[in-house]
Amino acid sequence: GDIHGQYQDLLRLFEYGGYPPSANFLFLGDYVDRGKQSLETICLLLAYKIRYPSKIYLLRGNHEDAKINRIYGFYDECKRRFNVRLWKIFTDCFNCLPVAALIDDKILCMHGGLSPELDNLNQIREIQRPTEIPDSGLLCDLLWSDPDQKIEGWADSDRGISCTFGADKVAEFLDKNDLDLICRGHQVVEDGYEFFAKRRLVTIFSAPNYGGEFDNAGALLSVDESLVCSFEIMKPALASSSGHPLKKVPKMGKS
């Protein structure tokens, strides 16, 4: 799930799950922005990708987009610590990242969620890279959409971009494509993970005490050879280092 520049928590994740190459890792995007150490976070992940390419896989999140990370911290961190040229090099890198992964032909993983334009997995395979993230359409939705318990079908998103989808759309898509589970990030959830649509979709968020503001846990999803899923939970700190009280996470909060 999302890391958002929380480098120490990324190291904790590897402590829990094992450092590469002892385990295979799939990350769901949002490596940068908001946290203080986006550069360490993305550089460690890319270094592992270079060293153990078949052991670590990095999907693209909505923050791996120049329009977004120009605003939410990564650009400023690059400029302050190095230079704008470095940020532009990362932009070129992010434009090449894959946007979805399929585990054992049964578990579909992406950062955001489903799209009204998505009927089958070949549509994802046909997305050309490198690419920027458009403001609407399939690629946008894969990185930006959210599940919503209160609706059926599709609805506009409070984010002002992309859409939300109901449990009926999850069931419809999974049944049509012979899949078991959708695994996605993109929303801070109190326990680090949260199920939706009769456990046919799971949201995973891996940045505990997100941004130093929330009292959420972080989670790591483990999938064994039989596709049995289990969760490792990184408990949140009891108080924020800033001395301010931590906010409770709203159900399916935004990130």
UniProtKB/Swiss-Prot annotation:
Write the record's keywords in alphabetical order, separated by commas: Hydrolase, Manganese, Metal-binding, Protein phosphatase
Q: Where does Mn(2+) 2 bind?
A: D30, N62, H111, H186
GO molecular-function annotation terms?
A: metal ion binding; protein serine/threonine phosphatase activity
Q: Where is the catalytic site?
A: H63 (proton donor)
Q: Which domain of life is it from?
A: Eukaryota
Residue ranges annotated as coiled coil are none
Entry EC no(s): 3.1.3.16
Residues annotated for Mn(2+) 1 binding in this entry: D2, H4, D30
Q: Which cofactor does it need?
A: Mn(2+)
Per its UniProt entry, what is the enzyme's top EC class, as one word?
A: hydrolase
A Pfam family that this protein carries is Metallophos
Q: Which reaction(s) are listed as its catalytic activity?
A: O-phospho-L-seryl-[protein] + H2O = L-seryl-[protein] + phosphate; O-phospho-L-threonyl-[protein] + H2O = L-threonyl-[protein] + phosphate
Entry note: cofactor: Binds 2 manganese ions per subunit.
Q: Which family does it belong to?
A: Belongs to the PPP phosphatase family. PP-1 subfamily.
Identification of the protein by name:
Serine/threonine-protein phosphatase PP1
